[in-house]
Amino acid sequence: MLYTAEILTIGNELLTGRTVNTNASYIASRLTLMGFSVRRITAIRDELEEIASVIKEILGRSPAIVVVSGGLGPTYDDMTAEGIAKGLDRKLVMNEDALRELREKYQTRGLPLTQERLKMALLPEGAKPIRNEAGIAPGFTLNVNGTDIVATPGVPREMESVLESFLNHMLTRRPPVYYYEESFLVRGVMESTLAPHIKGIVKETGVYIKTHPKGHETSEPYLEVQIAYSGENPDRVKEIVRSVKERVKAVVRELGGTLDRVQNP
């Protein structure tokens, strides 16, 4: 069974170029390795109506999971929880479990729970907090008509902590889907020459094959060929990838190319 996923990253700094969106790359990689097919990555500003609108739009496509990153902190422009609540037409409520976590973290440091700090415990009605082991603001999750919404902080180490906690929990709830890929390097065959052969193999097998140019198309053709597949049986997935890999390598040889530094023998 194919599980689809979407990623929503929130923050003005992502749209101005001040911050490189490394969170999206990390999340996409982790979801892919878990067998999800990531269909879209969206980046938007810290705007309440925009967050609400995009959440509605994403849910209309019914992905298995949407991971949201950013906007869970104590400042005026941290409005992800409120935006998600608005998009779901739910109330924003004080979550007792999130409040307990915040109280514990601030009291340990001898600090009071100000209104700004209490704000981080306001979650959409029905949401379950995810403990943030790397920082303060808790993440949260809720399921809407079969779609898991997972909200994580924007600070990379905190996003990773919250996301990994959720994914580890998810493994106990859903049958695993395995992702596997291998790649090898090709010299002496232009991408445009190899393209029709790749297209035919993809159409026949359903396996993902991608060529990544590393040299000049005509004067110095040099390609990385990536082959990837997902499925519920890990041994079968590897077998399919390796079988297709051998077919592509045979085509490369027929076209007069050479194989260089196989990365995943």
From Swiss-Prot:
InterPro entries tied to this protein: CinA (IPR050101), CinA_Arc (IPR023055), MoaB/Mog-like_dom_sf (IPR036425), MoaB/Mog_dom (IPR001453)
SUPFAM superfamilies xref list: Molybdenum cofactor biosynthesis proteins
Gene3D superfamilies the UniProt entry points to: MoaB/Mog-like domain
UniProt xrefs under NCBIfam families: PRK01215.1
Family: Belongs to the CinA family.
Name of the protein in question: Protein Msed_2121
Biological source species: Metallosphaera sedula (strain ATCC 51363 / DSM 5348 / JCM 9185 / NBRC 15509 / TH2)
